[in-house]
Amino acid sequence: MLGRNIKKYRLLSGMSLRNMADKLGVSHQTIKKYEEGSMMPNSERLIQISKLFNVNISDLLNAFIVPELKFENFRKQSKMSKSKEKGLYMLISDEIAKYLEILNYANEDYSFDKTKWEFKVNSSDDVEKISTEVRKMLGVSDDCALDNLTDKLEDNNFLILEIDYEEKFDGFCEYVDNLAFIILS
């Protein structure tokens, strides 16, 4: 998990392997080995890495079971670089993993009936019809405030997470372990 976290923070920082290696005074192959898990940084190097990314060592050592996400329903702003996008994917995966860990201790059922929310879109006219239908299902009007809409979605077992990330993205939704997640920037 350490290697995955090093890679996540490197990508979130927009650094290449070589860029990170130069900052740490090691070869890019060493960084690659850290990320692959075939080599472990010593404690001095671990401190150096945590300072480079301005994170706690515990953030580097976190070991959540990360779900496999497809990122099919991800909307980003076009100016986001590929490396920042990959870093964001890892960040979202980690946040969902943390949320799943918390839900393990909750004594509530958040399971989601996705068949109720599946709609077929063939044209732009369908989008308008579907949005009207969804508003009816949620019991909200056309001019519903965003906070109220979020509450209504959560009342219908949508799990909404807000992620603070330097680059804005429009949103993301994913179905994981019978749970429906909506991720907002």
Regions found by a protein language model. Name each.
Residues 1-22, 26-185:
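Short juxta-domain linker segments that transition from a proline/glycine-rich
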